[in-house]
């Protein structure tokens, strides 16, 4: 019975081992701007700490977890592989979310493309209404998490959603994310999360958001 279970576990994890064996290390992406470029909305100090400390920690932890997962999989240790999943989701999600977040911001992000603006008006009535609705649900996130504007390929519409902790957005293509972990704003905005959320629209990189929207529709 034990031998049969071990053989089954080995079969389950073997395909994963092949994937992990060829996967390269994750690296901290460079920012598309200098740390001070988003002032006064986000301070140099916050941006540097957020990028060099917090995002870097997610990347380092993710690489370590994948090494442990590779070892567990190679040994057919299904129990250990399963036990690593929460940490993989947390740190992997942190890396995914922040990699999107940095590109979503710019000192002069312009305006939504015509195609995106037309879709915003269709699905939300106006850009102001989209901003209000996404801001409201993001401010209301309990504890730490993210607010997202996403594109649902199935329904072919824009939707808004929130995700707890570092959970990545599911069921939609992420277009624009607002990080409401306290490390993203507390040094500057203290406990007044609404001020931070409302201010971040001033540095929304609509060029990047529009490009993500165009790619999502393909």
From Swiss-Prot:
Q: Which InterPro entries has this protein been placed in?
A: Fe/Mn_Superoxide_Dismutase, Mn/Fe_SOD, Mn/Fe_SOD_BS, Mn/Fe_SOD_C, Mn/Fe_SOD_N, Mn/Fe_SOD_N_sf, SOD_C_sf
The reactions it catalyses are:
2 superoxide + 2 H(+) = H2O2 + O2
- Requisite cofactors: Mn(2+)
Q: Which GO terms describe its biological process?
A: removal of superoxide radicals
User: Which Pfam families does the protein's record reference?
Assistant: Sod_Fe_C, Sod_Fe_N
Q: Where is the transit peptide?
A: 1-24
For this protein, the record's PANTHER family field holds: SUPEROXIDE DISMUTASE 2 (PTHR11404), SUPEROXIDE DISMUTASE [MN], MITOCHONDRIAL (PTHR11404:SF6)
The protein in question is named Superoxide dismutase [Mn] 2, mitochondrial
